[in-house]
Amino acid sequence: MTQEEYILIGKVLGVWGISGGLKIGVLTDFPERFDAGNELLVGRKLYTISQTNWQKAQVIVHLSGIDDIDTALELKDALVEIPASALKELPEGVYYDFQLIGLEVVDLSGVKIGQIKEILHMPSNDIYVSSYGVKEALIPAIKDVVKEINLKTGKIIIDPIPGLLD
């Protein structure tokens, strides 16, 4: 497996306690990835989760082989990843963020608007942040605007609502 085939699911924010717990900022919609017994790559090294404790949007994990604060401190700011082969299959029309970032955004007539740079997860709907000249376009991920997402062609076709690109 090449290094490009790993998917980011979190980042080590700090240590928790003297027994080597790691406080991880979670970047996945599947919190069960952090259940005890699962394997994670932390700093590109494979570990097994021995214990988990949730605290709001963060999780405290204890990993096999990390049992003191000094060893845990070496992993501060490390990326937490899983192999791409461990990704859950999503329903049709639902995508992982990494699949959308970098896609070209075009309007109904094929005119290039920009490229997806970021996805903002808002309560009502996601917002696709696209480059747009020297500015950014904030594209609501709703059916009235986003007409097609085609991973094979690498394009998102939109029908901009009035004012969207002003």
Curated annotation (Swiss-Prot):
A GO molecular function assigned to this protein is: ribosome binding
Tell me the HAMAP family matching this sequence.
Answer: Ribosome_mat_RimM
What biological-process terms (Gene Ontology) are attached? ribosomal small subunit biogenesis; rRNA processing
- Top-level lineage group: Bacteria
Report the function annotation for this chain: An accessory protein needed during the final step in the assembly of 30S ribosomal subunit, possibly for assembly of the head region. Essential for efficient processing of 16S rRNA. May be needed both before and after RbfA during the maturation of 16S rRNA. It has affinity for free ribosomal 30S subunits but not for 70S ribosomes.
Q: Which PANTHER family match?
A: RIBOSOME MATURATION FACTOR RIMM
User: Which residues belong to any copy of the PRC barrel domain?
Assistant: 92-164
> Whose protein is this, by species?
Dehalococcoides mccartyi (strain ATCC BAA-2100 / JCM 16839 / KCTC 5957 / BAV1)
For this entry, the protein name equals Ribosome maturation factor RimM
Gene symbol here is rimM
Q: Where in the cell is it found?
A: Cytoplasm
